[in-house]
């Protein structure tokens, strides 16, 4: 089940990505159609049908027959999108905005600012800022730097990918703390051993992944795990300008665990409790 179901008052079943069609957009300004692979089972609706029915019941009528009608409405509201028609995208077509004309002569814009930037002098503008030291400080008690990172395999909080046996075979709970071989030797930690990672905010158990990949003094952890949840460690130190949390710099301590057998059982028990709680929530 999805962890967000625990917070929901109403759950409306919708089609998955392979059960409907529409248009994808990406950070490269591209639009591309995608197509339904299989017919949905049971009493499901697409997201746009659900949103339309909710809006209509709340006094804002929304009536569409298909996704093309929705897309046509959207592109006519934005001049840069107007030329990106369903027909022009075709089966495997790919249109990058600006695409302002519906004629075939306008095939979109592969990259912006080909001749000059949209500034008074036609040049790009770069801004610098002064370096500011991290708010969290290393001490004898917390001598290592934790950075939260991403890795291939699982997505976000694993509410979906965590149910895939193939991905679980690649990596599973309680996740990993990547540390340098020199740090591992100094701390008496072996590869794949369970360890405690502590910060000023909290403490979690996870599995050591020892290699030369991390820098000495650094600890890298992904945020997908429920047991080895690195977000339990990071503090909410915010940048005064962007308000971005200082998740890439957190002072921590890594400790070996003498009784590995008991630690393994602890992880199994805690994981079972979490899954049981999610299962009960999903069942209502």
Descriptions of predicted regions:
Residues 1-4:
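Short, small-residue-biased leader/transition segments that mark boundaries at the very start
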Residues 14, 52, 119-121, 127-128, ...:
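Pocket-edge structural micro-motifs
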């Amino acid at each position: 089940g999805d962890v967000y179901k625990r917070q929901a008052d109403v759950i409306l079943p919708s089609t998955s990505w392979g059960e409907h069609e529409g248009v994808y957009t990406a950070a490269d300004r591209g639009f591309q159609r995608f197509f339904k692979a299989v017919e949905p089972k049971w009493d499901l609706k697409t997201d746009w049908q659900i949103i339309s029915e909710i809006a209509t019941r709340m006094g804002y009528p929304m009536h569409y027959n298909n996704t093309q009608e929705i897309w046509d409405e959207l592109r006519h509201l934005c001049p840069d999108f107007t030329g990106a028609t369903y027909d022009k995208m075709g089966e495997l077509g790919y249109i990058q905005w600006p695409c302002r004309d519906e004629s075939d002569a306008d095939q979109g814009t592969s990259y912006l600012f080909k001749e000059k930037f949209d500034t008074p002098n036609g040049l790009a503008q770069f801004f610098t800022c002064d370096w500011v030291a991290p708010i969290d400080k290393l001490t004898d008690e917390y001598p290592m730097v934790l950075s939260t990172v991403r890795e291939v395999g699982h997505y976000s909080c694993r509410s979906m990918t965590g149910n895939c046996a193939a991905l679980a075979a690649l990596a599973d709970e309680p996740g990993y703390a990547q540390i340098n071989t020199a740090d591992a030797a100094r701390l008496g930690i072996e590869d794949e051993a369970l360890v405690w990672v502590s910060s000023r905010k909290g403490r979690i158990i996870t599995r050591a992944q020892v290699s030369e990949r991390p820098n000495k003094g650094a600890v890298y952890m992904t945020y997908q795990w429920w047991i080895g949840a690195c977000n339990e460690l990071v503090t909410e130190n915010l940048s005064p300008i962007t308000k971005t949390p200082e998740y890439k710099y957190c002072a921590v301590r890594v400790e070996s665990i003498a009784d590995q057998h008991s630690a393994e059982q602890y992880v199994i028990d805690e994981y079972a409790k979490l899954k049981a709680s999610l299962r009960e929530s999903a069942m209502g």
